[in-house]
Amino acid sequence: MIRAILYRGADGQFTGYSAHGHSDYAEEGYDIVCAAVSILGVTCANSLESICGIVPEILENGSGALHYRLPASLSPEAMHDAQVIFGFLHQGLRDVAEQFPQDVNLSIQDWRKKR
């Protein structure tokens, strides 16, 4: 199962994304569920940079995992733009999870900084 997590800050705004696991919907190279989740996550990260000018901090990329978060301080305008992009990601992931509930688990969690 793919576990996708959207993270929110204390103010309720999206601050990061994580996905890991495999759907096993089909064999590697033919798994449309895995491809859908992957392209949504990568497109969000790329759009944050190319459209919004925000370079997300990539924490993990590879081995069936993608994890990134927004930089610590953004202008109100940049944060607004990031929320639009994350809204696209949220809607897309929700659609995939509803269509393939046995293959994708989507959750929204509070962002916890490691101390």
Identify the meaning behind each predicted range:
Residues M1-I32, V42, N46-R115:
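N-terminal intrinsically disordered, cationic/polar leader segments
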Residues V33-V37:
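Short, conserved glycine- and acidic-residue-centered signature motifs
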